UniProtKB/Swiss-Prot annotation:
InterPro entries associated with the record: Ribosomal_uS2 (IPR001865), Ribosomal_uS2_arc (IPR023454), Ribosomal_uS2_CS (IPR018130), Ribosomal_uS2_euk/arc (IPR005707), Ribosomal_uS2_flav_dom_sf (IPR023591)
Organism per entry: Methanoregula boonei (strain DSM 21154 / JCM 14090 / 6A8)
Lineage per the UniProt record: Archaea, Methanobacteriati, Methanobacteriota, Stenosarchaea group, Methanomicrobia
Protein name: Small ribosomal subunit protein uS2
UniProt family annotation: Belongs to the universal ribosomal protein uS2 family.
GO biological process, alphabetically ordered: translation
């Protein structure tokens, strides 16, 4: 068993050691817990913070990578309005060859064909269902599946695949997008020398 700070768990063939997940703060949730995210929560800390189960995070990254590689890269749209998510999300999109929309999402981008910049992705990846609610609503209208990085407080009603993670921290977001990139490239048989630091914003 590996015991570091928050957890005493063992991962089978993890993408990275448990210690690296913990160092990036991937497991640190919020002081709110949604019913939807209950199954991904490991425990609650003395200070009221809910802690996510890294085993679920690791498994879901693998599942999402397999799911996304079923699509052609240009059919994938990666969206984030969250500040710390913008750099790693765009790095992920650029590396795998996907489309990206960072910052404020333009209403109608998926639903209004006459809008300049209108796009028709086959699948969408969002950093936070709260901040990225507009694109999720449009995806639902269009029948486009949604993959979302979800924290302990998120609702997942319109999310098809959840990656449970701290979706607010800079290091956590860079770690998740790095691992997702690396795993997708591995499945495609593409070698990479990228590291987590390559996905970390300098802000």
């Amino acid at each position: 068993m590996t015991q570091v700070n928050e957890m005493e768990i063992e991962l089978k063939e993890p993408l990275i050691p448990v210690e690296e997940y913990l160092a990036a703060g991937v497991h640190i949730g919020t002081q709110q817990k949604s019913e939807d995210m209950k199954k991904f929560i490991y425990r609650v800390r003395g200070d009221g913070l809910y802690i996510l189960d890294i085993r679920e995070t690791d498994a879901r990254i693998k599942t999402v990578a397999k799911f996304l590689t079923q699509y052609e890269a240009p059919e994938i749209l990666v969206v984030t309005s969250r500040q710390y998510g913008q750099y790693p999300a765009k790095k992920f999109a650029d590396t795998i060859g996907a489309m990206s929309a960072t910052g404020r999402f333009i209403p109608g981008l998926l639903t209004n064909p006459v809008l300049d910049g209108y796009i028709e992705p086959k699948v969408i990846v969002v950093t936070d269902p709260i901040g990225d609610a507009q694109v999720i609503n449009e995806a639902v209208q269009c029948g486009i599946p949604v993959v979302a990085l979800c924290d302990t407080n998120n609702m997942t009603k319109f999310v098809d695949l959840v990656i449970p993670t701290n979706n607010k921290g800079r290091k956590a977001l860079s770690m998740i997008y790095f691992l997702l990139t690396r795993e997708m490239l591995r499945i495609r048989g593409i070698a990479t020398s990228l590291t987590q630091e390559d996905f970390e914003t300098e802000i």
